[in-house]
Amino acid sequence: MSAPTTSSSTDEDFAKPVKNGKTFANPKSFTNWGGIPGISDGFKFAFTETNHENVPCDKKILDVEIPVHNITADDFHSESDLFATWLGHATVLVDLEGVKFVTDPVWADRASFTSFAGPKRYRPPPMKLEDLPDLDFAVVSHDHYDHLDADAVKKITDRNPQIKWFVPLGMKKWMEGQGIGVDGSSTAVTELNWGESSEFVKNGKTYTIWCLPAQHWGQRGLFDRNHRLWSGWAVIGENRRFYYSGDTGHCDGEFKKFGEKLGPFDLAAIPIGAYEPRWFMKSQHINPEEAIEVHKLIRAKNSIGIHWGTYHMGSTEYYLEPRDKLKELMDAREDLKNTSFVTIEMGRIWEASDQ
């Protein structure tokens, strides 16, 4: 049985967000943070930038370029003590030493508050929500619609009433608004600040879940900008370590701390897409080159590139550029094994091979 503890610990060496009344902000130590693009930036983007995304309308072409391999819970298995599959965008299903969890579960056709506008999904998830294996817990990085899908959160909880949700500060109230973690519910929601951790116990094994700094922002409605914190996550088992960055700009000092204090990581899930134009996206989304630096700084043995090839995100890079650029850059690195940071096809199983 899974039995989350209520104890938590804090590492003061990690950066802390700035709290301004009801809202959060990135700290001044995040020197690459240039702020959230404003209205004038939006007009400049709309009228001066050319969209090079060019996603084909032909499904047959997409099936070749970005294959989706349909799987069920029965297919999600391995002899390895660490394996994972990419379910599209930032959703990664992981089995780490027998505990199963998912990052930012999103199944929506549109990453939006409405079904007729907003970022449209052009590659389907390889696994239906009802085909997920039994989950022990889930981590949510922030409240943007491409990372927090209310329908998926509720359906996962309905199927896994004992699941534990780990969320950054301010998000517990949102979860309770969905009926999750309220009085009388067997589902637990643990809200953490950057540098805080909580323990999860299953079958006598203890797993430590860390909430980690990320350079980003949050908003779901017109009047709730930055009311809920954003974060990355680390899951530490007895022998295996996993890191998920969430959406982030490049705050290299923090990434180095993650590697020194919690690494080396056996597997990391790092975003590589939605990064052009740089003047607009750099503060909030790393590009493939910066993703490789994150991979190195956190001392990841293996990383999977995510946050690409799923939704029309509004960025202007060619839709396959994140994958192709990552491979090109990794092939050119002499200090890193070129297979240590790769992309995988949706539904394919990645497994640690260093048993």
UniProtKB/Swiss-Prot annotation:
Residues reported to bind Zn(2+) 2: D146, H147, D247, H307
Please cite one Gene Ontology biological process associated with this protein: N-acylphosphatidylethanolamine metabolic process
Q: What is its EC number?
A: 3.1.4.54
Which cystines does this chain contain?
none
The UniProt catalytic activity note for this protein reads: an N-acyl-1,2-diacyl-sn-glycero-3-phosphoethanolamine + H2O = an N-acylethanolamine + a 1,2-diacyl-sn-glycero-3-phosphate + H(+); 1,2-dihexadecanoyl-sn-glycero-3-phospho-(N-hexadecanoyl)-ethanolamine + H2O = 1,2-dihexadecanoyl-sn-glycero-3-phosphate + N-hexadecanoylethanolamine + H(+); N-(5Z,8Z,11Z,14Z-eicosatetraenoyl)-1,2-di-(9Z-octadecenoyl)-sn-glycero-3-phosphoethanolamine + H2O = N-(5Z,8Z,11Z,14Z-eicosatetraenoyl)-ethanolamine + 1,2-di-(9Z-octadecenoyl)-sn-glycero-3-phosphate + H(+)
Effects seen without this gene: No strong phenotype in the nape-2 deletion mutant, however its overexpression alters growth and lifespan when grown at 15 degrees Celsius compared to 25 degrees Celsius.
Give the top-level enzyme category: hydrolase
Binding residues for Zn(2+) 1, per the UniProt record? H142, H144, H216, D247
User: What are the protein's UniProt keywords?
Assistant: Hydrolase, Lipid degradation, Lipid metabolism, Metal-binding, Phospholipid degradation, Phospholipid metabolism, Zinc
Q: In which tissues is it expressed?
A: Predominantly expressed in the pharynx, also highly expressed in the dorsal and ventral nerve cords, as well as in the vulval muscles of hermaphrodites.
The residues the record assigns to binding an N-acyl-1,2-diacyl-sn-glycero-3-phosphoethanolamine are: Y145, H285
Question: Which SUPFAM superfamilies does the record cross-reference, listed alphabetically?
Answer: Metallo-hydrolase/oxidoreductase (SSF56281)
Cofactor dependence is on: Zn(2+)
Q: Which InterPro entries match?
A: Metallo-B-lactamas, NAPE-PLD, RibonucZ/Hydroxyglut_hydro
Q: Does the keyword Metal-binding apply?
A: yes
Does the keyword section mention Protease?
Answer: no
Q: What does this protein do?
A: D-type phospholipase that hydrolyzes N-acyl-phosphatidylethanolamines (NAPEs) to produce bioactive N-acylethanolamines/fatty acid ethanolamides (NAEs/FAEs) and phosphatidic acid. NAEs are bioactive lipids that are involved in diverse physiological processes such as growth and lifespan.
Protein family according to the UniProt entry: Belongs to the NAPE-PLD family.
Name the record gives this protein: N-acyl-phosphatidylethanolamine-hydrolyzing phospholipase D 2
Q: Please tell me the species this chain comes from.
A: Caenorhabditis elegans
